[in-house]
UniProtKB/Swiss-Prot annotation:
Source organism of the structure: Brassica juncea (Indian mustard)
Residues recorded as bearing N6-(pyridoxal phosphate)lysine in the entry: 141
PANTHER family cross-referenced by the UniProt entry: ARGININE DECARBOXYLASE (PTHR43295), ARGININE DECARBOXYLASE 1, CHLOROPLASTIC-RELATED (PTHR43295:SF1)
Chain's gene name: ADC1
One function term, GO molecular function aspect: arginine decarboxylase activity
The protein's required cofactors: pyridoxal 5'-phosphate; Mg(2+)
Domain of life: Eukaryota
Enzyme class: lyase
PROSITE patterns: ODR_DC_2_1 (PS00878), ODR_DC_2_2 (PS00879)
Name recorded for this polypeptide: Arginine decarboxylase
Pathway membership, UniProt: Amine and polyamine biosynthesis; agmatine biosynthesis; agmatine from L-arginine: step 1/1
Alphabetically ordered keywords of this record: Decarboxylase, Lyase, Magnesium, Putrescine biosynthesis, Pyridoxal phosphate, Spermidine biosynthesis
Catalytic activity, EC: 4.1.1.19
Stated family: Belongs to the Orn/Lys/Arg decarboxylase class-II family. SpeA subfamily.
Residues binding substrate: 325-335
Amino acid sequence: MPALALVDTPVDAFSGDCSGVFIPPSPNSSSASLDWSPSLSSSLYRIDGWGAPYFAANSSGNISVRPHGSNTMPHQEIDLTKVVKKATDPKSSGGLALQFPLIVRFPDVLKNRLESLQSAFEFAIQTQGYESRYQGVYPVKCNQDRFIIEDIVEFGSSFRFGLEAGSKPEILLAMSCLCKGSPEAFLVCNGFKDAEYVSLALLGRKLQLNTVIVLEQEEELDLVIALSKKVNVRPVIGLRAKLRTKHSGHFGSTSGEKGKFGLTTVQIIRVVRKLRDVGMLDCLQLLHFHIGSQIPSTALLSDGVSEAAQLYCELVRLGARMEVIDIGGGLGIDYDGSKSGESDLSVAYSLEEYAAAVVASVRFVCDQKSVKHPVICSESGRAIVSHHSVLIFEAVSAGKRHETTPSDLQFLLEGYSEEARGDYENLYDAVMRGDRESCLLYVDQLKQRCVEEFKEGSLSIEQLAGVDGLCEWVTKEIGGSDPVLTYNVNLSVFHSIPDFWGIDQLFPIVPIHRLDQRPVARGILSDLTCDSDGKINKFIGGESSLPLHELDNNGYYLGMFLGGAYEEALGGVHNLFGGPSVVRVLQKDGPHGFAVTRAMMGQSSADVLRAMQHEPELMFQTLKHRAEELSLVHKPGGDKGNDKLVASCLARSFNNMPYLSVGTSTNALTAAINNLVYYSDEAAVGNGGGCGKNGKWSYSVD
């Protein structure tokens, strides 16, 4: 039966007298939760695909974090909603009074990822009879947060896990952190180099750090030779090779013969000859390559590793004292839960399969050439840090479904042209026939004609609204549209999810609560910036909208998952929206199941202004002085009470985060002015008195 035949439309539904127009009832949201469950939400949002083994929908309809992966016991699961409540509730209620957006870090997840990677390689080495070891490094560019890097060095110390740096600040950071790590841990020095960079790397060896200078450009060798002789340090040198193996995805653009980094075979031969000529060929000990991030399959991985292993064996034959093959990055994660490897969003292998493919490829080539098995190193940043960090943000408002009412149609047909009336009659006839296709055709025709007449000035806005209301109702009744609502979120896409804007990278985005309720709308997410690109309208699974719930007075919170790598490092300050608040959460046995060990309010407006070379202190004094001058004009002698109120308001605005303060985060104003750093008994207790976070200056409102 045609869709329109199901609608009880009276004969006068489209007449000039709109008192009898049929208006469909609003959907009953109370029935949305019937026959729904967290398991259905888990399937809808693919949580079991991309989230395993760290995230799941619990029986309460909230996202649970499993901090120890598949080894997590039921009582160790952490309800993410409880963490958010602890972070954002006012201090008077036992909370930390932090403001959204909020990054929640789980060091336990980070530890599990690191140990899982190590275990995967150790298992492959043991089962395949490989006669060396795996010794990885974390590329700090993925996320340079101090506590993340310190955790990685601590967690990986027992198996010599090291760091990779690609710039002078990163090398300083890595050297400092590795002073507390294993003395055998690698400090792999990649990237473009000048004399200062090379000098820092050589200084690292003087400090008994295991630094390796990897040649990315042939001319870097002259610097290394000259400076090492000058400071009397015998360097350990690696070289990066440009392989022929290349993967076709976005992340493969840095690989292949035309890649940005690395040496060709001709350049490699020249490097070997020069090192031999100066008596330093024994310093060449590491071969590095990088196929590209998010390697989709083990077949491609094996091709690249096999090619590199052949180069490694050739360097051994040429007399280099080779010891390490560094396979670079590329260990991918499954952003969409499909495990297909058919796009940059997924990979078709597990950690264990990845490690097995690497070990098998190196072993096969080295055995063929009778070369001693090298130490295998990888730079697996994305796979290590992506899961441990969750970005939480709130939906502050949402567009409403427009329900057409008789008042919307009161000007329908008044003063319309004969052509518009003709279009209307055609639409009316199609509605009465239940002809869906003709209805859509005449709706479009009527709207276009009336828009043109409005532009010409022959229709008023009320008359145009009458046509719009009619057409919306008809389209809805025949099932011609499923309106997608816009949910406005307290977030900057450019700061917190820059890869979505820059390279169309998708991340799982899911409500962190109400998963026991059926979503009743589909929506896109619009951020706070004044930019048309500041929206999220593509989601995993090829969807252009996200199933969402109606907003209520209790807050609606969404989580972006698997964004622990790169997003924080790449974020910009478009519209001067700065960094989010951050909490660090450890699993603890007890009634709540977790402990917040560190909490930091996000960047204030003053912080962001200062980063752009403004002087917030001077700005504050200028505005305060202007207010005092105007006060004298309007009231002889001034109004000190009002002056103090204005100054206090300005001070709060400078010290507060740029994001909206709504719901539970309204206490952020107080927190932004007072004590901004929260420590548990695990960390050093500190409250710098009048000097907030990072030595924040205070404003005088006297």
